[in-house]
């Protein structure tokens, strides 16, 4: 389903009665922790003059843009395009938490904002005027970067800044004075997107697929898969049934998954006595376990022609 694209592994699911019910997250998927909606309401009131419902007339309700926060109709705003773009800029510069979901339904004339926890989200490169964000001058000018810079922007932040704190800042409290004009040029190149936002975006898989309307591009096509699917060699050349079967069998070839397995209360655990490091492997083996956890065995097969 489109709402699960890039978030749930489309291959790694069991066959039989549990098909589609037992799911695995994709490689880059993250679960949000959530924060209170009150700071967002205060931001909309103070900076964007959002009207609460008890302050609005019938004409306002009919013509102004509705704002829903965590599913609650919280107010009405004018100039939704300006406010939407400003909120997205705040998200891409960590003034509001980077896991905040902001989507604008133009046809139905409402903006949805989600701050709650438990949402599945994933990172994507942004695209502007058919140019991917990884061509950003702020990125190219940096001699050293880290993941925090890629998702929160390149302006210098306080030492106590942490993206996991989910705090709402002002521009001056986070970056100091006279930094407002530098936000656009130094914003993040990667945005965390959930299903609600993805419904309003046009996401390309490859660089050649970018069109005028494209808003985002995948970091890498393999990130739509989970850990086990990315261990399969050339999954695009095999039937989907065999890929799903391979994911199920790979779990039984894992070596010592935990040193205290005798004391755990797992429902099931399969341990291979003599595991080996695969001779043929994908790049993800290096990233997942640094090739320090063997799994499976390398069979030796002799083939002879007999007539």
Where are these regions (language model features)?
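Conduit-forming functional cores of very large proteins
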Residues: 1-307
């Amino acid at each position: 389903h489109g709402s699960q694209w890039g978030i749930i592994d489309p291959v790694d699911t069991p066959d039989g009665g549990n098909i589609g019910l037992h799911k695995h997250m994709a490689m880059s998927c993250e679960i949000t922790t959530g924060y209170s909606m009150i700071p967002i309401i205060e931001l909309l009131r103070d900076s964007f003059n959002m009207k609460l419902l008890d302050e609005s007339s019938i004409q306002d309700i009919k013509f102004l843009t509705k704002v829903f926060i965590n599913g609650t109709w919280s107010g009405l705003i004018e100039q939704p395009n300006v406010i939407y773009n400003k909120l997205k800029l705040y998200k891409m510069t960590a003034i509001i938490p980077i896991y905040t979901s902001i989507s604008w339904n133009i046809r139905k004339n409402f903006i949805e904002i989600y701050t709650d926890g438990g949402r599945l989200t994933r990172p994507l490169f942004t695209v502007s005027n058919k140019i991917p964000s990884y061509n950003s001058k702020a990125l190219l000018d940096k001699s050293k970067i880290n993941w925090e810079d890629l998702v929160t922007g390149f302006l210098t932040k306080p030492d106590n800044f942490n993206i996991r704190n989910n705090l709402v800042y002002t521009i001056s409290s986070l970056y100091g004075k006279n930094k407002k004009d530098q936000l656009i040029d130094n914003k993040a190149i990667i945005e965390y997107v959930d299903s609600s936002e993805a419904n309003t975006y046009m996401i390309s898989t490859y660089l050649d697929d970018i069109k005028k309307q494209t808003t985002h591009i995948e970091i890498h096509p393999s990130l739509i898969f989970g850990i086990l699917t990315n261990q399969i060699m050339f999954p695009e050349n095999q039937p989907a049934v065999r890929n799903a079967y391979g994911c199920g069998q790979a779990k039984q070839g894992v070596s010592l998954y935990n040193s205290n397995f005798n004391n755990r209360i797992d429902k099931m655990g399969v341990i291979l006595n003599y595991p080996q490091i695969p001779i043929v492997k994908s790049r993800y083996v290096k990233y997942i376990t640094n090739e320090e956890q063997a799994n499976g065995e390398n069979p030796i097969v002799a083939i002879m022609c007999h007539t």
